[in-house]
């Protein structure tokens, strides 16, 4: 398949990329030439197997559109200490970027996962993410595969108008901190027609995310699609306008999840929609938890002060491997408001069935039928 955009092509082989050697210098030279080019331009890593150290593609670029096409299989150094930063392939301050191709970015993360439990050790050094997108506008990422990242596969920070289409993310279900796509402080994010199998959240939405639309995502193994955690730090920006629709979860720990810390600084998440979702043997299909406190790092006595409002759950069906299929635990200090719960049909076939639910600190409006029945205190 040819290069997808018209314009000049900057093939890394022409800049000294050699099969067995580290191609990072060749990639950076090709990027500099493409970025300085007036018209549309594309950096091409053609079919083949390559080794590549850390690379950072910096903008702004002269042309209005620039492509980065990966058709080869590119491997990161296996040793986590070979990285200066927390990103292996990073893109900064670029308008009109398209990252595409039939290739694979292989983070060779197996060594890092053994040391990666930063949840329990706040001072640990984060391993490198496969892909970092920072301060981008009008970006498209399509068709590529991220394999075995050392940490998050894809991190999106302070971006505006970025789309992920037909992306594949793969790592074992046992890999630690390998979130598929993490979004923070970004507006206008679309994730569609994408397959994510990993050891942590398939998609996680952090503070400051607005207008994020997630459709036609297959998630599993993994920890589901999460909003949060919110309220861990001071001055977090609010979350607004998150839609998760037409997605399938298979063998995951969670389906859709909202998590906020107790005893939190003030904050908010509003306009959250979870609709037309299929759960295949999911441990916690629906979980809204405002007492999220992993590893006992906080006190649950003081309530979360993250205000959750305008939340819709509708047409969520399938099978739960946990008896409590729906958990809605809103903050006792700041109850959820304007929650709508429509059709839910989740079955549990294990011991002590059928499925049950818990619901507290909210008075939802119900429509249609809920299985299990949901009674809120």
From Swiss-Prot:
Residues 1-5 form the signal peptide. Glycans are attached at residues 211, 345. It catalyses: [(1->4)-alpha-D-galacturonosyl](n) + H2O = alpha-D-galacturonate + [(1->4)-alpha-D-galacturonosyl](n-1). PbH1 repeats lie at residues 159-184, 186-207, 209-229, 239-260, 269-290. GO terms for biological process: cell wall organization; pectin catabolic process; pollen development; pollen germination; pollen tube development. Its main location: secreted. Optimum temperature is 50 degrees Celsius. It is found in: Secreted; Secreted, Cell wall; Golgi apparatus; Endoplasmic reticulum. It is an enzyme of class 3 (hydrolase). It comes from the Eukaryota. The active site is at residues 200, 223. Could be used together with allergen Pla a 1 for a reliable diagnosis of London plane tree (P.acerifolia) pollen allergy by skin prick test (SPT) in most patients of the cohort of 47 tested with a sensitivity of over 90% and a specificity of 100%. SUPFAM superfamilies: Pectin lyase-like (SSF51126). Keywords: Allergen, Cell wall, Cell wall biogenesis/degradation, Endoplasmic reticulum, Glycoprotein, Glycosidase, Golgi apparatus, Hydrolase, Repeat, Secreted, Signal. Expressed in pollen (at protein level). Expressed in stem, but not in leaves (at protein level). Glycosylated. Optimum pH is 4.0. SMART domains: PbH1. InterPro entries: Glyco_hydro_28, PbH1, Pectin_lyas_fold, Pectin_lyase_fold/virulence. May function in depolymerizing pectin during pollen development, germination, and tube growth. Acts as an exo-polygalacturonase. Monomer. Belongs to the glycosyl hydrolase 28 family. This is Exopolygalacturonase. It comes from Platanus acerifolia. The gene is plaa2.
